Amino acid sequence: MAKTFVGIGFGPIQSGLFLLEAFASGNFERLVVAEVVPEVVASVRRSRGSYWINLAEAGGLRSRKVAGLEIYNPLDAEDEPKLLAAIASAEEIATALPSVEFYDRGTPSPARLLASGFRRKLLHRELPSTVVYAAENDNHAAELLRDAVRAQLDPAERLRLDDRVQFVNTVIGKMSGVVSDPLLVQRDSLVPFIEEGHQAVLVEEFNRILINRIELDGFERGIEVFQEKSDLLPFEEAKLYGHNAAHALMGYLANRRHVTYMHEVSSSDLLPFVEQAFLEESGGALCRRHAGVDALFTNTCWAKYVDDLLTRMINPYLRDRVDRVIRDPRRKLGWNDRLIGTMRLALEQKLGSRRYALGAAAAVELLLATEPNQSVSKLFESIWGSSETRVDQHAIVGQIEKAREELRDFARKCNSI
């Protein structure tokens, strides 16, 4: 039976992962995407529903064309009903929005669009059941999206929704980005996203994506390459407190040394410094917390995981810019986010986190450069909010204050720290 895939949002993860894999599978008759930027919609239509993705492999670049895409603007009165019909008939849907906060934004919001499509599904039993992949970078994205959709339905519809629709979390360790400078697109021989355009989407060649186990009766995924896990949380933590934490640490410290591209770290003493943080601080804490859950959380497998990720992080063909990696330091200094969250996890497991404290200190310095009259404590209060229940807050802030002193010498020598 021919399947339909619908994407909500059209950034690099949607275009370079979900739609790309759906197209490559050959299992979908229809590929549909929702995009609110009129110029993008018009450009894709002029390209007859096709776009290009540049894939950074270990040995070079390769381009892939995705064709047959239907693109609709939910803000357009003519497009919205076509999009709702596609949602109602879709077997697989992926949301790939900037953050979970976008679920309820816009008129209509993504949650409202999904609810309207699912309402039709509930009324017509011949329409297929649906899996919704929540690709936003939040460990509870699927639950938040489900709640946002349920809020748009009446009580009777809510009771029936779980029988027809399953929202699943995702662990997406795929690095991606948009190259906006036409000179860089030309210099690196990248294929523009749209044939007539000047921007290019560049993603790494990686599709080992983890998802929750599918529990809908008789459901067969069209995107077959994803791997199902009964308990996704340990792997979500491995990504956030391992992959994301080490990537941020490398980025913030590379910025202190005025490095432009992440692959330039490969020839410096910063790389082994980050490797030790990834192995000992992230790995030590995560392997203790999740011992026995999966082979990943053993010293041998974790070391292989670290080696693979560091190699991918410094892939020169990915052309990953340091300023992209360190964007939005306020979010990355969040209480549960990659830097502070990893430090807290290490404290919980009675381990040190001096290297991640240095990365957090570098992120703090970026913020204080624009807010010079603010103390570190006040800065974190503005990021974290009320501190009454945060028993580790003083210890965390103390480690970062100490790391700020060490950071002054970091530009000269990494190994002495």
PLM features: residue spans?
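Substrate/ligand-engaging "lid" and interaction regions
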Residues: 1-417
